Regions:
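Membrane-interface helix starts
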Residues: 57-67, 71-86, 273-274
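Hydrophobic alpha-helical transmembrane segments of multi-pass membrane transport proteins
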Residues: 115-161, 246
Length: 298
């Protein structure tokens, strides 16, 4: 006890101040970052499980919102609608990429005297790899980025909190509806994209290089088993659900004002593209890695 404590008339600033004892600052440890990353991954997986688990309830309670989002996914809004929405973007991307496949395939096969097999190149590579990846990129760049921006704007404007206050389950209403709409819409969109990639390859081979249409169609149909088309649709449906989940997650948890929304959109596009590339490798190995549905000889 000091002399100041014994003087009842001491000035308040001279008396010792008693307050909460703050814990000492802990130095960062080497495993903090991996642990934080693991915790973030667990939160994301929990969010995805919550979204997918709410599908039956959402189908029952919000059918009109799902239909509205179906139109938005297919035809877009604002400036995106001017170019035909997601349909227009997918048509353009698959047409030109399919044309490149036909052009490069013909040039490579012509060097060894087997240019007549260019129909095989289109049927094999467009179906298994090229069309699903291009469709996934188009979906991420249009629908996914739009969903991230929408949910991010709602989050920073406190609209998500307002839904919670009104007892509306925000995850069901904002995220699950978008996942359902994207899953349903990707099927006709991918039909258009896959057929357009086939048309691009055929157009280059027949009209640019002058190959007989009958020859091209013969080898194209010969090396296109129906199971490959079904598995191609399986890939793009898995891609679509994963892309929308990633974009909605980052938009739903955006913070930091308009700049934060922009960062969320960029992070969502990067993450979805990398995830699709890794998942494409895994699914291709699982679906076609140990067996083949096409035999060129034998």
């Amino acid at each position: 006890m000091t002399a100041t404590d014994l003087q009842p008339g001491a000035a308040p600033e001279d008396r010792p101040r008693k307050g909460p004892v703050l814990p000492p600052v802990r130095e960062p440890r080497w495993f903090d970052r991996p642990v934080d990353a693991l915790a973030d991954l667990g939160q994301e997986l929990r969010f995805y499980a919550q979204v997918l688990g709410a599908i039956p309830t959402t189908l029952k309670n919000y059918p009109r919102d799902i239909v509205r989002l179906l139109s938005e996914v297919s035809f877009g809004t604002g400036a995106l609608a001017v170019i035909g929405g997601t349909i227009g973007v997918m048509l353009g991307m698959t047409l030109f990429v399919g044309s490149v496949v036909g052009m490069q395939g013909y040039a490579a096969l012509d060097q060894i005297g087997t240019a007549t097999l260019n129909g095989f190149i289109s049927a094999y590579f467009n179906t298994r790899e090229i069309a699903p990846l291009v469709a996934a990129l188009a979906l991420s760049a249009t629908v996914g980025a739009g969903f991230t921006a929408q949910l991010g704007a709602m989050r920073i404007n406190e609209e998500v909190d307002a839904l919670t206050v009104m007892a509306v389950p925000s995850v069901n209403y904002l995220v699950t509806t978008r996942v359902i709409a994207g899953f349903v819409a990707i099927i006709p969109l991918y039909v258009i994209g896959l057929l357009t990639s086939y048309a691009g390859s055929r157009m280059v081979t027949v009209y640019l290089h002058g190959q007989s249409a009958g020859t091209y169609d013969h080898y194209f149909n010969l090396f296109l088993p129906p199971i490959d088309i079904l598995l191609s649709f399986l890939k793009i449906m898995v891609f679509a659900v994963l892309i929308i989940l990633i974009h909605c997650r980052l938009g739903y948890s955006a913070s930091g004002g308009p700049a934060g929304v922009g960062r969320a959109v960029g992070a969502a596009v990067r993450r979805s593209i990398v995830t699709v590339a890794v998942l494409d490798l895994v699914m291709s190995m699982a679906l076609w890695g140990t067996t083949t549905t096409v035999r060129i000889a034998g």
